[in-house]
Amino acid sequence: EGFVKKIGVSLYNYGQIDCILGNYSIDLVQLPVNILDQRLLDSGHLKTLKKYNVEIHARSVFLQGLLLMQISDIPSWFNPIKGVLNVFHKEAKKRRISTLQLALSFVQSIDEIDKVVVGVNTLEQLHQIIEVMPLKVNIRDFSSLSISDKNFLNPSNWRI
């Protein structure tokens, strides 16, 4: 006894959230949330999870690094959403912050998010994230950047 403090699940969509909440008592969830993928925010599922006192960890904050790539380096497969990516880059530039800081600040500004999970490939990337984490950016409504096409929101669907 006492070996497990919290039980959690890693989920992908609100259908899974509904299923889990209807059948199990959990302490935390790990979910994809980023400035392009606002589905769980828009659907009210983040608020629902909080009503059940579930801790929420956001993952895919940088959408597998897509949000951090230079526009010129983004593969042509993403052409249908390049307009949205351009607006995202322009918003960061207008605010004089990096795309990393804007992407991270957006997720950190969501009241229901308790923790942010990030992945890095290098020590330099980790240092960059640590450097911008405490910086607070005044985030306005970025619903105009929200997309719903799962082909672009779920990296397992990417054809690159």
Language-model region placement:
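Short, low-complexity polar/charged micro-motifs in intrinsically disordered terminal tails
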Residues: 155-157
